[in-house]
Amino acid sequence: MRTRSLIVPIVLISLAVPLSAQMSRVALVRQSDIIFAGTVTRAGVVRVDQVFEKPDAVSLMKGDSVAVVAARAGSPPLNPGMQATFYTTGWIYGRWITVREVGHEPIGPQLATVAGTGTAQQDLVAGARQQVNDADLKARIQTAAMVVVGRVEQIRPPAYTGAPARPKRFTEHDPNWQEAIIHVDEGLKGATAGERVVVRFPGSRDVAFVGTPKFAAGQEGTFLLRKDSATGSPLALMAGQTVQAYTALHRLDVLSKQDAPHVRTLMRTP
């Protein structure tokens, strides 16, 4: 049975300046990983009314109390009864959770009402996060050499055409490079249907490669590929031919097959 205290003190290093005086909601969301709506109950204390975003490892729920500490002497106080959305980043975790406030956005009566999918403010935060995610994905698409929808036919050891340009260094963080042979079902950028592409990825489970996409035979998806500049040997062998090798090392480079329509839409958007 999980035991939790009724009061979770969280220190906010607060700018105590409303959103309009700082930056756009999208900019606030981009810099934040803990976002919640709350009501000031007394000087320096906020009751959490709704949690919009937080890391899975952070325990923060409706009804928890948050201690708000101003970052600068003379900052405007948060008055009792004030409702706001707080955009913050986690800092210190222990008996007290300490977060830095990026900014806060006062919630007026028009935003406190319940919308069809939750509070109106929740919808605004979710919309801003979607804009952030789309902007990040579009940037990855624009810099990719190839964008394809396809299926991994096989995984094999790397077939280098020559010795890597950089001597191999043997460390505990050896990437253990592997190659995925991907059959292109649909080429969205830089490829045509029916092609086969060599994609290199670190097979190592070392902490240095946590979050780096891994491939498996039979895997289907939408892949954003870049010419291999990581292994020191950018060319590979396939069916007796020398071909360009690619990588997909960012979490946004490997998406589901169902994400292909959204990728197409972003590619058409100016």
Model-derived features: positions:
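Bacterial N-terminal signal peptides
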Residues: 7-18
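Transition segments tied to proteolytic processing and entry into folded domains
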Residues: 18-270
